[in-house]
Amino acid sequence: MWDLLVRGGRVVDPASGLDAVADVAVRDGRIAEVRPHERGAGLAAEDAAEVADAAGRLVTPGLVDLHTHVWHGATYWGLDPDPIAWRTGVTTWVDAGSAGAYSMDGLRRFAAELARVRVHALINVSALGLVAETGEHHNLDNLDVDTAVAVAARHGGFVRGVKARIDARTVGRHGLEPLRRAAALARRLDRPLMVHVGYGPPTIADIAPLLAEGDILTHCASGCPTDLVADGRLTAPARRALDAGAVFDLGHGSGALAFDVLEAELAEGVRPVASSDLHARSVHGPAFDLPTVMAKLVAAGAGLPEAIAAATVRPARALGLDAGTLAPGAAADIAVFDAEEGRFPVVDVHGSVRESPVRLTNTATYVDGRLLPPCAAEPPPPWIPLSGSQRRAEEDRVGATRSAVRRLESPEDFDEPFPRAGS
Ligand SMILES: [Zn+2]
């Protein structure tokens, strides 16, 4: 007997090499069996307590977003993941440096443990984390490696790596010293280092020599660094980082996706992780959510299965997470989408437009085999500027949420008696 059977969808699970019409059975919060239809009949509906018909839909592992900011109510960038997860299929959220040593305990207790989704963290090398818009490295007293090691040790597997924003504004006059300390911290924890790149200095040529195999270069398709891609080719330092085993991660955010850079990287053989860098300033656009970022990756030339790999198995492996697959025994984190085919315009942060041949609209999201309930987001905090169209979209969303509540008041609503307690 199964608790849930997701039947007849196109199941794409790159970790298992599966792309076929199949049934997915769940028992005790775990994937119990996945049976492709070509191997005979599907799984029997009678054997399941609940059956979800996914015919004509796309079924993937719950998506894994490698770069997000979920320390809401405590930082400049933070947002609550649950109001976004249920409508996007993202079941694993990696918070990228919102908390440093001083607030890791708070991120865990007041954001991660209260969320319905899975949350992991990268510890910021600055003990201040991302409480403010920038400047966390301006006072090096806050970048104490011993303190960060001690805090990370208390949090075991919750802390999956280290984060450092390395751009001119964030490092101030300290140049590469914040990066050196972040690298030292990552080596001592034996975990990957995620480096945010932007307007330098430091440049990619400065940063790349400090990256080790498995470290993550986030904002990899940003138009901001001047020496990431040149004349449609990876620059020598970017090529060196790639060849040394650095993971290239999109980290779309509010300013880090340029189609010309991404297209050059794909042509050069980069297979990036698709992450949203979702935060209070990117959730209303231009990133919106991870399925939108995946559609942009497809628009830039990657196939849909490749985009799914970039948002499931690849980010999971980058941090050694037990997520991103529908293999039997895995946690039953499942995303179901309407994968509409057509020509859908998508835009990068510089206003360049491409057409995606697919648009992903999430129709159901399960964590541990349980359907995430719809849930409305809080209004954006006062320091987040919204454009006129972003404000109107926000008002529409609030209005639609209110009008979703229907009273039972027409005569047909009373054609049978309401159930009474005890009857
Ligand atoms: Zn970020």
Task: Tell me the role of every PLM-derived stretch.
Residues 1-44:
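N-terminal metal-binding scaffold of metallo-dependent hydrolase/deaminase domains
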Residues 164-264, 268-284:
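Active-site core of metal-dependent hydrolases
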